[in-house]
Amino acid sequence: MHKELTIENFKCFSEPTTITLGKINICLGCNSVGKSSVIQSFILIRQAFEKARLFKDTQVKKYHIQLNDIYGLQLGDSEHIKSSKVKDDITLKLDEYEYKLMSIAESPMEMEAANEYDVSVQSLREGIFSDGFYYLNAERTGPRNYQMIDSKTINHCGVYGENTMHLLNVLGTVSRVDSERCYNLDEGKTVSTLNKQVEYWMDYIIPGIEIRTDDVLELRVSKMTLRQPALDTDFLSPYNFGFGISYVLPIIVTGLIAERGSMILVENPEAHLHPKGQSHIGYFLAVMACSGIQVIVETHSEHVLNGIRIAALKNKVAPDDISINFFSLKKEGKNTRHMVEKINLDERMNLENWPEGFLDQEEEDLRTLRLLRSKGI
């Protein structure tokens, strides 16, 4: 498990900024304060490692890192993502592994990185250097009647969840889920096949939904239909059920199939979910993290955080295994600086520090309502 990520000269992080990591890591804060930059840093490190692994038996020691169109990255020009014109490189350090990304004059949409480490040794490490690396973009695929089947063998849902239907159809009845990840909140739900465990967890997050998938190989498409047993209808198009199911399904499938010792990056798991569903997806992600997967979550939802805290208390997770990082802007004179503050938890999962702006909007709104009412408005 990785312990520490340091970012320098990348987007809003002009100075070296270190983020402590645990089994499950939550990035919280307002918009445009650096949360997504953390996710992108992991992706750039992963890409540098993959290039080094590809060329490990060659004389190539420096690699071109793509800034766009890989793992969903859309970073644009290399000069635009440096936070300082004085510094030439972007520095990303994960534990003892440090990567310096340099601009390439003739190819501004790429950067050059060297890998000074033994790739064979790195590959034995868990986390970002393991075979399993899973990333789900905030802009996941919405309701679709079908998805195209990738011509390559796939073992993940895809950055946008675009492989989810096919993967579930192929593995649903033949793949067994590790006992630590199996749904354990109902003694009657004990079948460990992937399709049943997906059904159990989906019912926990969005109650009363049944899923059916099928491949039409001659057309190279996977189909999905949904049904609510409470209604007297047959299986229907996903378009009849809104965005929540389509957005959360890849998260559930990814968590259940991810390799032990791997890493999952998830942006906005709460998207299109009711607050109860947001809490429950947080609970699910915490359970996955307890089973030996390092989870990185970028979220705006206090409900996701509370679901994680509930799971941690219920499953006796140590406070140090949960890393809550609050991203904010701090004014210092005429200047504004990006800050990352770790929010500590005690043994009872109480938040030990509560900086200004941290999940306090409800309190602010209630205060405003009281003030307006006192003025007779």
Task: Identify the residue ranges that each predicted region occupies.
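Pre-Walker A-like glycine/lysine-rich segment at the N-terminus of P-loop NTPase domains
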Residues: 1-48
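Phosphate-coordinating catalytic segments in nucleotide- and nucleic-acid-processing enzymes
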Residues: 4, 48-250, 254, 259, ...
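Walker B catalytic motif
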Residues: 266-269
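Phosphate-binding P-loop
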Residues: 16-22, 229-230, 256-260, 287-289
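C-terminal lobe/lid and adjacent interdomain/linker elements of RecA-like ASCE P-loop ATPase modules
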Residues: 280-377
